[in-house]
């Protein structure tokens, strides 16, 4: 028989065991996070899962890197496109060195003393003259000319073929003639391929009077015009720098026999005619100009030697309506050497810009003289770096870039049609950006 005392302790034992079992169950649940006690909420001890869950939601937003990066990439693309929009109108302006192209302007002609395109818009060619083809033929190759166009924005190349002097056309044998004509042909083709104009220059110098080799000139230009009559980009310069005792009457007599040879084949080609005193005397031409269409008269200057008086000669002729082409110039002295005269060079450039004159700087070579555009210790013939250029080469390159930049900034020079086109493209760009950001579409 069980006593009361035994019953009492049996009940106590059962209760203790129950407490232990229940406590163990709750303890395990608490550790797993399955149970939250009321007093825990008051002390801020939230359930582990409730703390972790918002963190998981936040992670989902920040982990999607393409979405967060896409607007940044779109901004970059937008900026790049805007740069293209700024550069594009430069091709619509006449003064921009990089804007004049054969494809855009086509065949040129002279109208009221100004070089113009087919629609009568003034055209300003900015170019480089070679040195003598017999001395430095490596600078008039396809690679060299393409480099000038792509890296410098040059749109005309002048091919200086000496008539006398070293391996001149008129003093060498047939092999010399053939080599020079091959040089010209490669350069003309390269200029055409690169959307440029090209000047074939009958480069008299020590022969002084163009009449000395007039028969050779007639034969040469007859051959050239028949070969290139379909090339709208070819310009003929029939006598570089008449000098010594040669007068305008002498030059006019020569021109009246050579120009018809070209005109018999090509009615419209631009023909450049040299003037007395190393192509610096325009006054005598004003009194008695040639009676042909599409004729321009050459004027040469070197900033280190020719200053205000020479500029007055040029501007007076221009004001009188004489069509002038600066087929050769330099920023150094007239002997082709010395340092750049920056003060006078800037004044000359102002005249060129004001009258929208076409010009070719002398000379593309690495000859050890101030007028060479390439440093004498540089053996490259294309893709020049800035440090590969001479003092004049660097000055010229900087000038080209400043002209290009200033024209880009002159929004007022753009036609209303061009402005409207630019604004329309910018609006389309902004709309595209909004759509890309909202839809996160893949850009083309």
Q: Which ranges hold each PLM region?
A:
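Extracellular glycoside hydrolase catalytic/binding regions
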Residues: 106-108, 132, 137, 197, ...
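N-terminal, intrinsically disordered, polar/charged segments of Gram-positive cell-envelope systems
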Residues: 35-101, 416, 420, 424-428, ...
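Gram-positive cell-envelope targeting signals
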Residues: 1-51
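Short, low-complexity, Pro/Ser/Thr/Gly-rich segments in the mature regions of secreted, periplasmic
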Residues: 397-412, 416-421, 425-444
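Conserved beta-strand edge residues that scaffold enzyme active sites
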Residues: 163, 205-206, 331, 366
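Acidic/histidine-rich helix-loop elements
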Residues: 119, 123-144, 163-178, 334-337, ...
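Aromatic-lined substrate-binding rim segments of carbohydrate-active enzymes
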Residues: 141-205, 214-219, 263-265, 341-355
């Amino acid at each position: 028989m069980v006593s009361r005392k035994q019953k009492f302790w049996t009940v106590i034992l059962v209760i203790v065991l129950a407490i232990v079992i229940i406590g163990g169950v709750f303890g395990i649940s608490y550790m797993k996070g399955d149970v939250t006690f009321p007093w825990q909420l008051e002390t801020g001890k939230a359930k582990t899962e409730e703390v972790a869950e918002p963190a998981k939601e936040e992670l989902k937003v920040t982990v999607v890197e393409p979405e967060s990066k896409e607007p940044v990439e779109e901004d970059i693309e937008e900026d790049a496109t805007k740069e293209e929009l700024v550069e594009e109108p430069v091709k619509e302006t006449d003064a921009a060195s990089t804007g004049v192209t054969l494809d855009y302007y086509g065949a040129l002609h002279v109208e009221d003393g100004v070089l113009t395109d087919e629609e009568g818009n003034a055209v300003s060619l900015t170019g480089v003259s070679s040195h003598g083809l017999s001395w430095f033929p490596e600078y008039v190759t396809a690679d060299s000319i393409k480099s000038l166009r792509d890296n410098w924005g040059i749109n005309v190349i002048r091919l200086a073929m000496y008539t006398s002097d070293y391996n001149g056309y008129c003093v060498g044998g047939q092999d010399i003639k053939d080599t020079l004509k091959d040089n010209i042909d490669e350069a003309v083709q390269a200029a055409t391929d690169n959307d440029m104009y090209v000047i074939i220059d009958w480069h008299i110098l020590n022969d002084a009077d163009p009449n000395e080799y007039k028969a050779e000139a007639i034969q040469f230009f007859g051959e050239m015009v028949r070969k290139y009559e379909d090339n709208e980009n070819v310009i003929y310069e029939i006598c570089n720098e008449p000098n010594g005792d040669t007068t305008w009457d002498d030059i006019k007599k020569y021109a009246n026999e050579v120009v018809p040879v070209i005109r018999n084949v090509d009615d419209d080609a631009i023909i450049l005619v040299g003037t007395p005193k190393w192509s610096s005397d325009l006054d005598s031409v004003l009194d008695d100009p040639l009676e042909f269409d599409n004729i321009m008269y050459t004027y040469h200057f070197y900033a280190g030697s020719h200053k205000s008086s020479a500029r007055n000669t040029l501007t007076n002729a221009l004001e009188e309506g004489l069509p002038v082409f600066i087929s050769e110039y330099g920023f150094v002295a007239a002997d082709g050497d010395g340092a750049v005269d920056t003060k006078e060079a800037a004044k000359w450039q102002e005249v060129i810009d004001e009258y929208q004159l076409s010009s070719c700087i002398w000379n593309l070579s690495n000859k050890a003289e101030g007028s060479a555009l390439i440093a004498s210790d540089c053996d490259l013939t294309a893709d020049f770096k800035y440090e590969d250029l001479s003092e004049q080469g660097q000055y010229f390159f900087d000038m080209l870039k400043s002209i290009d930049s200033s024209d880009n900034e002159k929004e007022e020079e753009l036609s209303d049609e061009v402005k409207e086109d630019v604004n329309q493209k910018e609006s389309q760009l902004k709309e595209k950006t909004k759509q890309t950001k909202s839809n996160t579409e893949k850009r083309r």
